[in-house]
Design a protein with these regions (language model features):
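Transmembrane-embedded, aromatic-rich helix segments that form part
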Residues: 44, 86-104
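Short acidic/glycine- and proline-prone juxtamembrane loop motifs at membrane-interface regions
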Residues: 34-41
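Short helix- or helix-capping micro-motifs
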Residues: 19-24, 31, 51, 77, ...
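Hydrophobic core segments of transmembrane alpha-helices in multi-pass, intramembrane catalytic enzymes
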Residues: 42-50, 72
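Transmembrane-helix signature of polytopic, membrane-embedded enzymes
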Residues: 3-25, 44, 67-68
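Membrane-interface transmembrane helices that cradle and orient dolichyl/undecaprenyl
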Residues: 49-69, 104
Length: 179
């Protein structure tokens, strides 16, 4: 349903229905269901974060809608980061999309779009998301200001991807691959 809402917002309702059917009937979708229970939550948070960003960009001038979308964005991003912190990296294309639309294309935003409101709202979204993330991680409750950042630094030091790779007929640990 979220894919339909995003497609309908970007294109039209007919395109939204077609894109929803293609995504829903895609056999890869059913093949990967329940592979990792966290991925379902991450996908949910990513889709709804995208939709909420689109609606925020369209309706920033309406005070009630703006507050509503800021709260929802904080909740969905907090849900995603509460499950897995690398979720933040999946939001980078959204941020890039927003910056391009705000400063260059203005296809979704209107002429009255305020960058100052956007920055203030982004701070509120990040505070809400951070609060939910900390709430979901009981091992950081001892010090909610330093422990999450220590864990983030530990995760950044570890290698990403598969632990072993076949290179030139020899198996190597991914982070010790000769170049």
């Amino acid at each position: 349903f979220g894919i339909y809402k995003i497609s309908s917002t970007l294109f039209n309702k007919q395109a939204g229905k077609i894109i929803f059917l293609i995504c829903f009937l895609n056999p890869i979708f059913f093949g990967h269901m329940a592979m990792n229970p966290k991925d379902t939550i991450i996908a949910f948070a990513n889709i709804w974060s995208t939709y909420i960003l689109l609606k925020y960009l369209q309706n920033q001038n309406s005070s009630n809608k703006r507050k509503h979308y800021v709260l929802l964005a904080g909740l969905t991003i907090g849900l995603g980061t509460g499950v897995r912190i690398p979720f933040l990296m999946t939001l980078m294309p959204l941020l890039l999309f927003a910056v391009v639309d705000i400063f260059f294309t203005k296809k979704i935003t209107n002429s009255k779009f305020s960058i100052n409101k956007f920055i203030v709202d982004l701070i509120f979204v990040l505070v809400i998301a951070y609060s939910l993330t900390v709430f979901a991680w009981p091992h950081v409750h001892g010090n909610i200001f330093t422990e999450p950042f220590k864990l983030l630094l530990i995760q950044l030091k570890s290698s990403f991807g598969v632990p072993w790779i076949l290179f030139d007929g020899i198996f190597y640990e991914t982070d010790k691959l000769p170049y």
